[in-house]
Protein backbone atom coordinates (compact mmCIF):
# COMPACT_ATOMS: atom_id res chain seq x y z
CA UNK A 1 0.00 0.00 0.00
CA UNK A 2 3.01 2.33 -0.09
CA UNK A 3 2.53 5.35 -2.37
CA UNK A 4 4.57 5.33 -5.57
CA UNK A 5 5.35 7.95 -8.21
CA UNK A 6 5.08 5.66 -11.21
CA UNK A 7 2.68 3.52 -13.21
CA UNK A 8 3.28 0.57 -10.87
CA UNK A 9 2.40 -0.41 -7.32
CA UNK A 10 4.33 -2.69 -5.01
CA UNK A 11 3.03 -6.22 -5.40
CA UNK A 12 4.88 -8.84 -3.37
CA UNK A 13 8.32 -9.49 -1.92
CA UNK A 14 10.30 -12.62 -1.14
CA UNK A 15 13.01 -11.53 1.29
CA UNK A 16 16.49 -12.05 -0.17
CA UNK A 17 15.15 -13.39 -3.47
CA UNK A 18 12.90 -11.03 -5.43
CA UNK A 19 10.10 -8.50 -5.35
CA UNK A 20 7.54 -7.49 -7.95
CA UNK A 21 5.70 -4.44 -9.19
CA UNK A 22 2.23 -4.66 -10.73
CA UNK A 23 0.77 -2.22 -13.25
CA UNK A 24 -1.70 0.25 -11.74
CA UNK A 25 -4.68 0.53 -14.08
CA UNK A 26 -5.68 3.84 -12.47
CA UNK A 27 -2.31 5.49 -12.88
CA UNK A 28 -1.98 9.06 -14.08
CA UNK A 29 1.22 8.14 -15.93
CA UNK A 30 -0.39 6.29 -18.85
CA UNK A 31 -1.27 8.00 -22.12
CA UNK A 32 -0.01 11.50 -21.41
CA UNK A 33 2.12 13.34 -23.96
CA UNK A 34 5.31 15.21 -23.06
CA UNK A 35 7.03 17.55 -25.53
CA UNK A 36 10.65 18.54 -24.97
CA UNK A 37 12.12 21.76 -26.40
CA UNK A 38 15.67 23.10 -26.15
CA UNK A 39 14.81 25.20 -23.10
CA UNK A 40 11.31 24.14 -22.11
CA UNK A 41 8.71 21.40 -21.75
CA UNK A 42 4.99 20.96 -22.38
CA UNK A 43 2.98 18.32 -20.50
CA UNK A 44 -0.50 17.26 -21.65
CA UNK A 45 -1.89 14.40 -19.59
CA UNK A 46 -5.57 13.48 -19.61
CA UNK A 47 -6.30 9.76 -19.62
CA UNK A 48 -9.68 10.03 -17.90
CA UNK A 49 -8.45 8.26 -14.76
CA UNK A 50 -6.53 11.02 -13.00
CA UNK A 51 -6.78 14.81 -12.84
CA UNK A 52 -5.89 16.35 -16.19
CA UNK A 53 -2.60 18.23 -16.52
CA UNK A 54 -1.82 20.78 -19.22
CA UNK A 55 1.21 22.90 -18.38
CA UNK A 56 4.22 24.45 -20.06
CA UNK A 57 7.59 25.38 -18.59
CA UNK A 58 10.36 27.52 -20.02
CA UNK A 59 10.68 28.43 -23.71
CA UNK A 60 8.39 26.16 -25.74
CA UNK A 61 9.36 27.38 -29.20
CA UNK A 62 11.63 25.92 -31.84
CA UNK A 63 12.58 22.31 -32.49
CA UNK A 64 11.08 19.66 -30.24
CA UNK A 65 10.25 16.00 -29.86
CA UNK A 66 7.31 14.32 -28.14
CA UNK A 67 6.70 11.00 -26.47
CA UNK A 68 3.67 9.30 -24.97
CA UNK A 69 3.80 7.48 -21.64
CA UNK A 70 2.99 3.78 -21.86
CA UNK A 71 1.88 1.17 -22.58
CA UNK A 72 3.39 -0.76 -19.69
CA UNK A 73 3.98 -4.42 -18.99
CA UNK A 74 1.75 -6.03 -16.41
CA UNK A 75 4.42 -7.07 -13.91
CA UNK A 76 8.06 -6.23 -13.28
CA UNK A 77 10.12 -8.70 -11.26
CA UNK A 78 13.30 -7.54 -9.53
CA UNK A 79 15.66 -10.40 -8.72
CA UNK A 80 18.00 -9.63 -5.83
CA UNK A 81 21.70 -10.54 -6.16
CA UNK A 82 24.40 -10.33 -3.54
CA UNK A 83 27.06 -8.79 -5.77
CA UNK A 84 27.72 -7.34 -9.22
CA UNK A 85 29.33 -10.49 -10.63
CA UNK A 86 26.24 -12.60 -9.97
CA UNK A 87 23.89 -9.93 -11.33
CA UNK A 88 25.78 -9.42 -14.59
CA UNK A 89 26.29 -13.15 -15.09
CA UNK A 90 22.50 -13.50 -14.93
CA UNK A 91 22.25 -10.67 -17.47
CA UNK A 92 24.67 -12.38 -19.85
CA UNK A 93 22.76 -15.65 -19.50
CA UNK A 94 19.47 -13.94 -20.38
CA UNK A 95 17.94 -14.49 -16.95
CA UNK A 96 17.30 -10.76 -16.44
CA UNK A 97 16.65 -7.98 -18.96
CA UNK A 98 18.52 -5.18 -17.20
CA UNK A 99 20.58 -4.55 -14.07
CA UNK A 100 19.94 -1.70 -11.65
CA UNK A 101 23.36 -0.76 -10.32
CA UNK A 102 24.13 2.78 -9.09
CA UNK A 103 27.82 2.07 -8.47
CA UNK A 104 29.17 1.54 -11.98
CA UNK A 105 31.05 -1.57 -13.07
CA UNK A 106 34.64 -2.74 -12.82
CA UNK A 107 36.76 -2.17 -15.92
CA UNK A 108 37.22 -5.87 -16.67
CA UNK A 109 33.47 -6.43 -16.32
CA UNK A 110 32.77 -3.47 -18.62
CA UNK A 111 35.12 -4.95 -21.23
CA UNK A 112 33.50 -8.36 -20.81
CA UNK A 113 30.01 -6.94 -21.34
CA UNK A 114 31.17 -5.09 -24.47
CA UNK A 115 31.96 -8.47 -26.05
CA UNK A 116 28.49 -9.93 -25.45
CA UNK A 117 26.54 -10.13 -28.75
CA UNK A 118 23.70 -7.63 -28.85
CA UNK A 119 25.02 -5.57 -25.92
CA UNK A 120 26.08 -1.98 -26.55
CA UNK A 121 28.15 -0.35 -23.82
CA UNK A 122 28.34 3.38 -23.09
CA UNK A 123 30.84 4.91 -20.66
CA UNK A 124 30.26 8.16 -18.81
CA UNK A 125 31.35 9.69 -15.53
CA UNK A 126 29.24 8.80 -12.52
CA UNK A 127 27.31 11.51 -10.70
CA UNK A 128 28.69 10.72 -7.30
CA UNK A 129 31.75 10.71 -5.08
CA UNK A 130 33.57 8.48 -2.61
CA UNK A 131 35.26 9.86 0.46
CA UNK A 132 37.30 8.83 3.47
CA UNK A 133 36.41 10.21 6.89
CA UNK A 134 38.54 10.60 10.02
CA UNK A 135 36.91 10.51 13.44
CA UNK A 136 38.01 13.93 14.69
CA UNK A 137 36.54 13.20 18.14
CA UNK A 138 39.36 10.78 18.99
CA UNK A 139 43.13 10.61 18.51
CA UNK A 140 44.81 10.38 16.01
CA UNK A 141 42.02 11.64 13.75
CA UNK A 142 41.65 14.68 15.99
CA UNK A 143 45.15 15.85 15.04
CA UNK A 144 45.33 18.06 11.94
CA UNK A 145 48.94 17.21 11.10
CA UNK A 146 48.07 13.50 11.10
CA UNK A 147 45.20 14.04 8.68
CA UNK A 148 47.43 16.14 6.45
CA UNK A 149 50.19 13.51 6.50
CA UNK A 150 47.75 10.80 5.45
CA UNK A 151 46.42 13.04 2.68
CA UNK A 152 49.97 13.63 1.45
CA UNK A 153 51.20 10.04 1.41
CA UNK A 154 47.97 8.78 -0.22
CA UNK A 155 48.69 8.78 -3.96
CA UNK A 156 45.10 8.67 -5.19
CA UNK A 157 46.11 9.31 -8.80
CA UNK A 158 48.30 6.19 -8.78
CA UNK A 159 45.46 3.96 -7.58
CA UNK A 160 42.88 5.52 -9.90
CA UNK A 161 45.01 5.36 -13.03
CA UNK A 162 47.27 2.33 -12.51
CA UNK A 163 45.13 0.00 -10.39
CA UNK A 164 41.53 0.99 -11.18
CA UNK A 165 42.40 1.76 -14.82
CA UNK A 166 40.84 5.19 -14.91
CA UNK A 167 37.27 4.21 -14.01
CA UNK A 168 37.07 7.16 -11.59
CA UNK A 169 38.61 10.62 -11.36
CA UNK A 170 40.41 12.30 -8.49
CA UNK A 171 38.58 14.92 -6.43
CA UNK A 172 40.28 17.24 -3.96
CA UNK A 173 36.97 18.74 -2.80
CA UNK A 174 33.24 18.17 -3.01
CA UNK A 175 32.68 20.42 -6.03
CA UNK A 176 33.00 18.69 -9.46
CA UNK A 177 36.09 20.03 -11.21
CA UNK A 178 34.08 20.58 -14.41
CA UNK A 179 32.41 23.55 -12.68
CA UNK A 180 35.47 25.67 -13.27
CA UNK A 181 33.77 28.92 -12.22
CA UNK A 182 33.14 27.51 -8.74
CA UNK A 183 36.17 25.35 -7.99
CA UNK A 184 38.95 27.09 -6.08
CA UNK A 185 42.56 26.17 -6.92
CA UNK A 186 44.06 23.40 -4.80
CA UNK A 187 46.30 24.88 -2.11
CA UNK A 188 48.12 23.81 1.05
CA UNK A 189 49.23 20.23 1.65
CA UNK A 190 47.34 18.79 -1.32
CA UNK A 191 49.09 21.23 -3.64
CA UNK A 192 52.47 20.65 -1.98
CA UNK A 193 52.20 16.87 -2.40
CA UNK A 194 50.71 16.81 -5.91
CA UNK A 195 53.00 15.15 -8.43
CA UNK A 196 55.42 13.74 -5.84
CA UNK A 197 56.69 10.18 -6.17
CA UNK A 198 56.36 7.60 -3.38
CA UNK A 199 59.66 8.47 -1.70
CA UNK A 200 58.94 12.20 -1.81
CA UNK A 201 55.42 11.68 -0.43
CA UNK A 202 56.79 9.64 2.47
CA UNK A 203 59.45 12.21 3.32
CA UNK A 204 56.96 15.09 3.04
CA UNK A 205 54.46 13.27 5.27
CA UNK A 206 57.15 12.71 7.90
CA UNK A 207 58.01 16.41 7.75
CA UNK A 208 54.33 17.28 8.31
CA UNK A 209 54.15 15.03 11.37
CA UNK A 210 57.38 16.42 12.79
CA UNK A 211 56.19 20.00 12.28
CA UNK A 212 52.97 19.06 14.08
CA UNK A 213 54.80 17.90 17.20
CA UNK A 214 54.97 14.16 16.51
CA UNK A 215 58.03 12.20 17.64
CA UNK A 216 59.48 8.78 16.88
CA UNK A 217 62.30 6.55 18.09
CA UNK A 218 63.25 6.08 14.44
CA UNK A 219 61.55 7.96 11.61
CA UNK A 220 62.15 5.17 9.10
CA UNK A 221 63.15 5.65 5.48
CA UNK A 222 62.12 5.09 1.89
CA UNK A 223 64.45 3.42 -0.60
CA UNK A 224 62.75 5.00 -3.59
CA UNK A 225 60.97 3.47 -6.55
CA UNK A 226 58.11 1.07 -5.92
CA UNK A 227 59.46 -0.12 -2.57
CA UNK A 228 57.42 0.26 0.59
CA UNK A 229 58.80 2.58 3.21
CA UNK A 230 60.50 1.30 6.33
CA UNK A 231 57.93 2.61 8.80
CA UNK A 232 58.78 4.83 11.75
CA UNK A 233 58.98 3.08 15.11
CA UNK A 234 57.93 4.33 18.51
CA UNK A 235 55.82 7.04 16.91
CA UNK A 236 53.89 9.33 19.25
CA UNK A 237 51.60 12.28 18.75
CA UNK A 238 51.90 15.76 20.24
CA UNK A 239 52.33 15.56 24.00
CA UNK A 240 53.64 12.00 23.79
CA UNK A 241 50.28 10.36 23.06
CA UNK A 242 50.69 6.85 21.63
CA UNK A 243 48.39 6.02 18.69
CA UNK A 244 45.97 3.16 19.37
CA UNK A 245 46.67 -0.31 18.03
CA UNK A 246 44.32 -2.30 15.79
CA UNK A 247 42.66 0.75 14.24
CA UNK A 248 40.21 -0.14 11.45
CA UNK A 249 39.36 1.58 8.19
CA UNK A 250 35.82 0.46 7.36
CA UNK A 251 34.91 0.31 3.66
CA UNK A 252 32.34 -1.58 1.56
CA UNK A 253 33.60 -4.92 0.28
CA UNK A 254 34.69 -5.61 -3.29
CA UNK A 255 31.39 -7.27 -4.17
CA UNK A 256 29.51 -4.06 -3.36
CA UNK A 257 31.97 -1.42 -4.53
CA UNK A 258 35.40 -2.47 -5.83
CA UNK A 259 36.53 1.18 -6.02
CA UNK A 260 36.21 1.94 -2.31
CA UNK A 261 37.39 -1.54 -1.39
CA UNK A 262 40.59 -1.18 -3.42
CA UNK A 263 41.30 2.36 -2.27
CA UNK A 264 40.84 1.39 1.39
CA UNK A 265 43.54 -1.29 1.10
CA UNK A 266 46.05 1.19 -0.28
CA UNK A 267 45.26 3.95 2.21
CA UNK A 268 45.52 1.54 5.14
CA UNK A 269 48.89 0.40 3.82
CA UNK A 270 50.11 3.99 3.47
CA UNK A 271 49.11 4.69 7.07
CA UNK A 272 51.03 1.57 8.10
CA UNK A 273 54.07 3.01 6.31
CA UNK A 274 53.75 6.04 8.59
CA UNK A 275 53.98 3.77 11.63
CA UNK A 276 50.24 3.48 12.40
CA UNK A 277 48.56 0.14 13.12
CA UNK A 278 45.66 0.38 10.65
CA UNK A 279 43.82 -2.40 8.81
CA UNK A 280 41.23 -2.08 6.05
CA UNK A 281 38.08 -3.95 7.08
CA UNK A 282 35.50 -4.84 4.36
CA UNK A 283 32.12 -4.12 5.95
CA UNK A 284 28.52 -3.99 4.75
CA UNK A 285 27.33 -0.53 3.73
CA UNK A 286 24.46 -0.44 6.23
CA UNK A 287 26.71 -1.81 8.97
CA UNK A 288 29.11 1.10 8.42
CA UNK A 289 26.24 3.58 8.53
CA UNK A 290 24.95 2.14 11.81
CA UNK A 291 28.44 2.09 13.29
CA UNK A 292 29.51 5.65 12.48
CA UNK A 293 26.28 7.67 12.46
CA UNK A 294 24.72 6.64 15.77
CA UNK A 295 25.44 8.85 18.84
CA UNK A 296 26.29 5.96 21.13
CA UNK A 297 29.06 4.81 18.76
CA UNK A 298 30.50 8.24 17.96
CA UNK A 299 33.87 7.50 19.60
CA UNK A 300 34.09 3.79 18.76
CA UNK A 301 35.65 4.06 15.30
CA UNK A 302 38.63 5.73 13.63
CA UNK A 303 38.17 5.81 9.83
CA UNK A 304 35.59 4.86 7.23
CA UNK A 305 34.92 5.20 3.51
CA UNK A 306 31.46 5.84 2.09
CA UNK A 307 30.04 8.03 -0.66
What are these regions (language model features)?
Residues 74, 97, 300-302:
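Conserved acidic residues
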Residues 72-76, 130-132, 245-247:
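Short amphipathic alpha-helical segments
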Residues 117, 230, 289-293:
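Alpha-helical scaffolding within the catalytic cores
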Residues 14-16, 62-66, 77-138, 149, ...:
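Extracellular/periplasmic solute-recognition and catalytic clefts
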Residues 248, 272-307:
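Periplasmic binding protein-like
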Residues 1, 5, 131-133, 143:
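A structural "hinge/loop" feature
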Residues 9-12, 16-67, 142-273:
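Append "and occasionally in soluble cytosolic enzymes with long acidic Gly/Pro-rich linkers
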Amino acid sequence: DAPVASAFVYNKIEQGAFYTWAYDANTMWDGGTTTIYKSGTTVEWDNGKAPAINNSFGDTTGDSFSYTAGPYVGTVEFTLYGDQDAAYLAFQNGEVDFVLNPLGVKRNLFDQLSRVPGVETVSNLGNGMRYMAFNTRVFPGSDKSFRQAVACISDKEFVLNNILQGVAVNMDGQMPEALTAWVAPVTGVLADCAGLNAEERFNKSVEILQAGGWTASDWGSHAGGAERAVAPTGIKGPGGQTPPSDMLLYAPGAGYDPLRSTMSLFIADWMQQLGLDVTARPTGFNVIVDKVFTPENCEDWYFYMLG
